[in-house]
C-alpha cells in the first residue's frame, strides 16, 4: 500500500522546468489515462451504443414497414377508385346510349303521333267537306224541288178552270175505284 500512497504523493513532485525526464507514474501520464478512459468507454459504451443503434434501426425498419403498408393501402385504394371510375364511366355510357335511344324512340313516337293526328284532321276535313257538299246539294235539290213545285202549282192554277177541275176529280175518282177493285 505504501507504493500506492507513494504514487499519489509523487503527483505533487513535478520536474523542474527545462529538464527532461521519463515519468514512470502511470496515473500522471496523459496517453495512458486517455487510453484507459477510451477503453472503459468502448467497453461499457459499446453495449449502450449498440442498444441505441439497434433501437434506432428498429424504429427506421418499423417506419419503413409502416410506409410500405400505407403505400400498399394507398395503391389498393387507388385501384378501387379506378375500378369505381371505370364502372361509373360504363354506366354513364349506358345512360348516354339509352338516353339517345330513348330520345330517338320518343322522336319516332312523336312523329308517328303527329302523322296520325294529321291523318285524322285530314279525314275530319274531308268528312266535313263531304257533309257540307251533301248538305249544299240537298239544299239545292230542296230549293229546286220547291221552285218546280211552285211553278207546277202556278201552271196548274193558271190552266185549271172549274170544268177542267171537275173532270180531273172525276177521272181520279174512277181511277181510285178501279184500283180498289184490283186490290180486292
From Swiss-Prot:
CDD domains, A to Z: ATP-synt_Fo_b (cd06503)
GO cellular component terms listed in the entry, alphabetical order: chloroplast thylakoid membrane; proton-transporting ATP synthase complex
Topology term for the membrane: Single-pass membrane protein
Pfam families in alphabetical order: ATP-synt_B
Superkingdom of origin: Eukaryota
Keywords: ATP synthesis, CF(0), Chloroplast, Hydrogen ion transport, Ion transport, Membrane, Plastid, Thylakoid, Transmembrane, Transmembrane helix, Transport
Family per record: Belongs to the ATPase B chain family.
Biological role stated in the UniProt entry: F(1)F(0) ATP synthase produces ATP from ADP in the presence of a proton or sodium gradient. F-type ATPases consist of two structural domains, F(1) containing the extramembraneous catalytic core and F(0) containing the membrane proton channel, linked together by a central stalk and a peripheral stalk. During catalysis, ATP synthesis in the catalytic domain of F(1) is coupled via a rotary mechanism of the central stalk subunits to proton translocation.
Subunit structure: F-type ATPases have 2 components, F(1) - the catalytic core - and F(0) - the membrane proton channel. F(1) has five subunits: alpha(3), beta(3), gamma(1), delta(1), epsilon(1). F(0) has four main subunits: a(1), b(1), b'(1) and c(10-14). The alpha and beta chains form an alternating ring which encloses part of the gamma chain. F(1) is attached to F(0) by a central stalk formed by the gamma and epsilon chains, while a peripheral stalk is formed by the delta, b and b' chains.
Name of the protein described by the UniProt record: ATP synthase subunit b, chloroplastic
Record gene name: atpF
Amino acid at each position: 500500500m505504501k507504493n500506492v500512497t507513494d504514487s499519489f504523493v509523487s503527483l505533487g513532485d513535478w520536474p523542474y522546468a527545462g529538464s527532461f525526464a521519463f515519468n514512470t507514474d502511470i496515473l500522471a501520464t496523459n496517453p495512458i489515462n486517455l487510453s484507459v478512459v477510451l477503453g472503459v468507454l468502448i467497453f461499457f459504451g459499446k453495449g449502450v451504443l449498440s442498444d441505441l443503434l439497434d433501437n434506432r434501426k428498429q424504429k427506421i425498419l418499423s417506419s419503413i414497414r409502416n410506409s410500405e403498408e400505407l403505400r400498399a393501402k394507398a395503391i389498393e385504394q387507388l385501384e378501387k377508385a379506378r375500378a369505381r371510375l371505370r364502372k361509373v364511366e360504363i354506366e354513364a355510357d349506358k345512360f348516354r346510349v339509352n338516353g339517345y335511344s330513348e330520345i330517338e324512340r320518343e322522336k319516332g313516337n312523336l312523329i308517328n303521333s303527329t302523322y296520325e293526328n294529321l291523318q285524322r284532321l285530314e279525314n275530319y276535313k274531308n268528312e266535313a267537306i263531304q257533309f257540307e257538299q251533301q248538305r249544299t246539294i240537298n239544299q239545292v235539290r230542296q230549293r229546286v224541288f220547291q221552285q218546280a213545285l211552285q211553278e207546277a202549282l202556278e201552271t196548274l192554277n193558271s190552266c185549271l178552270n172549274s170544268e177542267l177541275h171537275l173532270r180531273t176529280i172525276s177521272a181520279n175518282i174512277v181511277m181510285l175505284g178501279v184500283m180498289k177493285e184490283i186490290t180486292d
